[in-house]
Amino acid sequence: IPYKEYITDFAKDNAKLTGTEKDNLKYAHEEADKFLKESSGVVNYLVKEFEMKKNAQLHARTTISKTGIIDPLKLHSYKFAEDIFKKISSIPNQKNHGMIFLLDWSGSMQRHIMPTTEQLLNLVMFCRKINIPFSVYKFVNNSEFDTHGKNTNHPKAPFVLTDKTPQCDQSTRLVQLFTHKQSKSDFKRSAQNIYRSAMYFGGYYDWRNPDHIRVPSIHAKYYMSSTPLNESLIAMDTILAKFKSDYKTDKVALVTLTDGSANSVSTKKGSRMAIKLGNKYHLCEYRWRDEKKDLTYHLLEYLKKKYRLQTIGFFLVKKYQELRYSFHVPYKKEALARSMFNKNKFIPDYSTGYDVYFYV
């Protein structure tokens, strides 16, 4: 779904609001505008840091955690984004670099959706400032609709399925939120829409926060559902090819912001799933504590090899205990890992299909 359609759908719904609903919409937009204004100073600082790193004769720099400008202890704060900026700054020519973001829009993200949205908006503003090609999508699979927001009986489907292909979720949609080609006004509208959505859904888990009641509901086809990450990575094969062709990028960074593993993808007639990497076929099957066998891992490996892709993942949690089924460390290092996470509020993992996977 292109960003123009996303903006238009919200505008049509907004036109139907009456009375108090209009006041509540104004409140949501004002909150979004306030955040963008407050964040502009921090983004400008990060841009300055980026330019310093590009300049070979400037060796000294003040780390973000010591400036006082950015709070390194804030969940999903700029300290975590700095690792992304380091990836960008390692490229000699920024104009030949691009970024694609995938935002998890599943129901379980409600607890994290506001800080995640704020983090995403800061990254988008940063990319706009340094003028690199980028595109931002949220992946959803609202079962009421297909990719065009029609009834599920609508004949058009995103995947061509046969008995020999993975049985991907046909309700999967990639909603484009932002792109470097957006006008300033369209960027603002998209930012207001996603911020309002985060206010609305985030209120479900916070009884002290009246925003769920106060903020108007959003268009039905943009509601939260589950996590079609694998389907989204399959779609990236098409999106990345066009992105690299259109913008002549030498390097592309793919960043996912999620709170857990992908939905499973089944096969027909009990067949086993495999993906071809180079001259070899690799079986894709779920094994507990062995992510290197699953479909997500192999899809990332496929995309990295085909597109010279850098991959960065963010896994969002409230506390270290939530990592017990995802982040696996030797028993003797468990106490150290817990201590690092509690101190820094994040911990990196280099053993997944991503180049680096941050548990935040």
Please tell me what each predicted stretch does.
Residues 1-360:
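Acidic, glycine-rich A-domain
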